[in-house]
Design a protein with these regions (language model features):
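Membrane-embedded beta-barrel scaffold of Gram-negative outer-membrane proteins
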Residues: 12-71, 92, 96-102
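Outer-membrane beta-barrel translocator domains and adjoining extracellular loop/strand segments
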Residues: 1-8, 48-56, 94, 99-107, ...
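Hydrophobic packing within well-folded, soluble alpha/beta domains
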Residues: 38, 75-77, 89, 178, ...
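Exposed loop/turn and edge beta-strand positions of beta-sandwich/beta-sheet ligand-binding modules
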Residues: 7, 17-19, 32, 59, ...
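Conserved C-terminal beta-signal and adjacent last beta-strands/turns
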Residues: 21-22, 115-228
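Residue-level signal for pocket-adjacent positions within structured domains
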Residues: 8, 40, 58-63, 113-114, ...
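Gram-negative outer-membrane beta-barrel transporters
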Residues: 42-44, 63-161, 225-227
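Short strand-coil-strand connectors
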Residues: 30-32, 82, 181-183
Length: 228
């Protein structure tokens, strides 16, 4: 016979409270050709709610993790080089750790303390960089415009558990798009994860086993839109 399940302990948890502080600015420079957004933030969270793997290994439950703090910066830049070329870059840094987290005891009655560990599912770095170049044609031409676009998106490091024993290191994906615009038709040919990068998008544990949800491989597609 297994240990009797305490339903109240697994279904009842306290509300989460947080104090959030943020300063930032939005700038438009060089007659609007360069736009920037800058921000810095700090979050002080108490009774933080997280999804925790249960000791039996059969699923997860919501628990209060004590307190945590998060701080970081975000920056984005959008530049219109000329009427044909646009470029954008964005970056974010987040440092999110538990200030206090009593994880209970192990089967051998050893105390579990996750204080100082990183909060799971929070990427430390996020970034995006992209560029679009457009060719514009005479309005009498059947082709109105042709746009070539490329972008690179990255994230990591990401911890998947409060133990910080499973993680995904920093990864990036390359994406591209070609858009053809006519008076009534728009055709987009696109590719995602062009380098076929392999990474983990989610992790969970059940029956004392860990399972990873893997990334989607290289994808190619075509979108067609008709304007009435």
């Amino acid at each position: 016979y297994g240990k009797e399940l305490n339903v109240q302990e697994t279904t009842v948890y306290k509300p989460e409270y947080s104090w959030n502080y943020e300063v930032g600015s939005h700038l438009s420079l060089f007659n609007g050709k360069l736009k920037t957004d800058l921000a810095a933030f700090y979050m002080d969270t108490h009774d933080q709610q997280i999804a925790k793997f249960v000791n039996s290994g059969l699923g997860r439950m919501m628990v209060n993790a004590g307190s945590s703090e998060s701080y970081g910066v975000e920056a984005s830049f959008l530049a219109s080089i000329n009427k044909n070329l646009n470029m954008n870059v964005s970056y974010g840094y987040t440092h999110s750790t538990f200030k206090k987290y009593d994880g209970g005891t192990t089967s051998s009655e050893e105390q579990i303390d996750y204080s100082g560990n990183y909060v799971p599912f929070v990427p430390r770095h996020t970034m995006n960089a992209g560029a679009n170049y457009s060719f514009f044609f005479d309005k009498s031409n059947w082709m109105q415009s042709l746009t070539l676009g490329m972008s690179y998106t990255g994230a990591g490091k990401i911890y998947w558990t409060e133990k910080n024993n499973v993680s995904q290191s920093f990864y990036g994906t390359l994406n591209g798009r070609i858009s053809l615009q006519t008076k009534a038709l728009q055709i987009d040919v696109w590719g995602r994860n062009l380098t076929n990068k392999d990474y983990t998008t989610f992790y969970f544990e059940t029956m004392h086993r860990g399972f990873e949800q893997k990334s989607r491989p290289l994808q190619l597609g075509v979108d067609i839109r008709y304007h009435f």
